[in-house]
Amino acid sequence: MSCPIMEPIPPMAPVLLSACLKEAGFSSIGKDLNIDFFNHFKDSGHWGDIHNLFAIGHVTKISLPRRVIIDILKFIKQYLLEVKKQYDPEYIGLSIFTSESVDFSILVMSYIKKYLPEVKIVLGGRGLENHHGLTDMKHYEMYNKFGMADLIVVGDAETSLIDALTDDATGIY
């Protein structure tokens, strides 16, 4: 599942990795949360502020009306519950394509843990390899330290993800 990068561009990683997993005998589907989120909120009248909040929110103070924040959280919850209903996944993988995806991914991970506690969270993507602005850690190190994901695949994942899932690996792989 792609985490929003706040641009209406379909990311390739979820579809590519889904195909690799299928080839290796896993059941998998690529979901584009990025496009679904964009389509849901683009005409809300608040898209500019929503975009800025998640794209540069950790740098700049952006203020959104409470109702918009509630709508974003409801969207994430409904999206995840629909994924659960349709696919009943054992894992949900999040593609953190750029550092713009990082803030949104934290919301998604917290909602997976809250509403789908039996589903394991797998993270990957180049956005995880950037340094967190407030620490010396890279994002994937921070996520691992605080137990935000069950498995974090660093680097190209076409084969390492398959190996990690086959080995039932946890932590940084």
Predicted regions and their residues:
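Flexible, glycine-rich phosphate/dinucleotide-binding loops
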Residues: E7, F37-N39, N130
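Nucleotide-activated donor-dependent transferases that construct or modify glycoconjugates
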Residues: M1-M6
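Glycine-rich, highly charged phosphate/nucleotide-binding loops
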Residues: G48-K84
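Short glycine-rich hinge loops at helix-strand junctions in the catalytic core
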Residues: G25
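Short alpha-helical interface elements
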Residues: G45-H46, L53, L116-P117
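N-terminal beta-loop-helix "entrance" segment that forms/cooperates
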Residues: F37-I50
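Glycine-rich beta-alpha loop elements in corrinoid/cobalamin-binding modules
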Residues: A13, L17-C20, I29-I35, I69-Y173
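Conserved phosphate-interacting/catalytic interface
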Residues: P10
